[in-house]
Design a protein with these regions (language model features):
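A short, well-ordered alpha-helix in the C-terminal region of glycosyltransferases
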Residues: 377, 384, 391-406, 415-418
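Carbohydrate-associated surface elements
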Residues: 173, 195
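Conserved acidic donor-binding segment of nucleotide-sugar-dependent glycosyltransferases
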Residues: 363-364, 368-375, 384-389
């Protein structure tokens, strides 16, 4: 079986160093597939002067194609969209057929010579018909890590799904939304959870749970963006600091908000669409969220909050190992990578009860849930854990066990192989 993974047309896709979650996912899965005698993997990515157009690494062949005029065309379309200020548009620029059309057409044409069985694309449903047009015998897998299929124009998505043989989502939360909206395609939808690296237990720094002298450290890992609920976390910090004056909060992640069009503009959830107040309107959408967060901090809290910024993924593990609790206050979350990363390192989690995170955390066993946007409840659950080291340790151990059972890269690869085999063996 030969699988072609078609990367989203941005990011590095460096085989020697992965940064984004999809780059990590692709590398971890493709490299494991290549360990099977009857599997080969190709990864398509955008052309980059730093890397050769074709190279191999750990059995994976990387093939890079030019974007041509794609980026100029997309910038012009985005500018036009923002000038017109479409309210609640269900087919924004990123979901249009022309979006990165040169990229996907080049991939589709190259695929004709690669003798692949499966083309595995991510999130951009408009790529599926292009692949099928030039490769009618190729099976197309659409991997969704967001809610776009249930948020974008229903008729447009329905037509595109005709070119998709299997829809794989990162959580049952996403899968069920797609099945409810498109019942005719329900049997083509399934869930394959994300995976995580699980360090040796000797590397997880469990002695922190026995120390009463060290300052307690809270950790947030993710984009500093309105939908991640960082404003609720900082509001909760006032009560947390009052109860535990020695606490520190590390906020690790890029301080650039998610594009307004990608989520807030198309969401049917009033809590999420209400985040539009954090975005400016007009031709240029100034990102004011990070500045507003820093301005909201009172002095007694400000010196307890550390904005670390973006760090290489390999270095994030160090933050987990020196943390006591992970907090994820997201208002929208398809899965919750930070939860399984923290749990893999034996750390308890305090998370909002939203999206795919409800399938990861077991309330009262591996951490605590709180209702999204409830800063008081967030503070209460966090303080409970901070004041109880035995509870932190037992929940951390339970979380690590849960990750070992459900969220290993080996599980991901085996689940995918099962789906691949099913559609390849099925009759058209």
């Amino acid at each position: 079986m030969k699988i072609a993974f078609i990367s989203q047309p941005f990011g590095d896709m460096n085989p020697h160093h992965q940064s984004s979650s999809l780059e990590i996912w692709t590398y971890e899965v493709a490299s494991r597939l290549c360990n099977y005698d009857d599997c080969d993997a190709i990864v398509y990515a955008r052309e980059d002067d730093r890397y050769p157009k074709i190279e191999e690494h750990k059995g994976i062949q990387y093939r890079r194609v030019s974007l041509g005029l794609d980026e100029k065309t997309n910038r012009l379309a985005n500018t036009t969209e923002r000038i017109l200020s479409y309210p609640r548009q269900k087919l924004p620029v990123f979901a249009q057929q022309f979006y990165y059309q040169n990229y996907i057409k080049q991939v589709a044409l190259d695929l004709r010579d690669q003798d692949c069985d499966i083309a595995h694309i991510f999130n951009f449903s408009q790529f599926a018909p292009v692949i099928k047009e030039h490769n009618s015998n190729l099976k197309v897998v659409l991997n969704m890590t967001c809610e776009w299929l249930s948020q974008l124009d229903e008729n447009v998505i329905k037509r595109r799904l005709q070119s998709v043989d299997q829809v794989i989502s990162c959580s049952n939360y996403i899968t069920h939304k797609i099945q409810q909206r498109f019942p005719a395609y329900a049997d083509r939808c399934t869930t394959v959870y994300n995976g995580v690296y699980i360090p040796d237990s000797n590397s997880t720094n469990e002695e922190r749970f026995q120390s009463e002298e060290e300052n307690k450290r809270l950790l947030f890992v993710g984009r500093v963006s309105p939908e991640k609920g960082v404003h609720d976390l900082l509001q909760a910090m006032h009560k947390i600091v009052e109860a535990c004056p020695d606490v520190q909060l590390d906020i690790v992640g890029p301080t650039i908000s998610l594009a307004y069009e990608y989520l807030v503009m198309i969401s049917d959830d009033p809590t999420v669409s209400g985040l539009s107040s954090f975005y400016t309107k007009g031709l240029v959408r100034h990102d004011t969220y990070f500045k507003s967060l820093k301005a909201s901090l009172e002095p007694d809290v400000a010196n307890r909050v550390n904005f670390i910024g973006q760090v290489p993924h390999a270095d994030i593990m160090c933050f987990y190992q020196h943390a006591d609790i992970l907090i994820n206050p997201s208002l929208s979350e398809s899965f919750g990578i930070s939860l399984i990363e923290a749990m893999a390192n034996g750390r308890p989690v305090v998370a909002s009860r939203v999206g795919g995170m409800q399938e990861i955390l077991i309330n009262g066993e591996t951490g605590f849930f709180f209702e999204p946007g409830d800063a008081d409840a967030l503070a209460e659950k966090t303080i409970t854990l901070l004041k109880n080291p035995d509870m932190r340790k037992s929940m951390g151990m339970a979380g690590r066990q849960r990750v070992q059972e459900l969220f290993t890269w080996e599980n991901v690869t085996q689940d995918l192989l099962l789906q691949y085999s099913r559609i390849v063996d099925s009759e058209d």
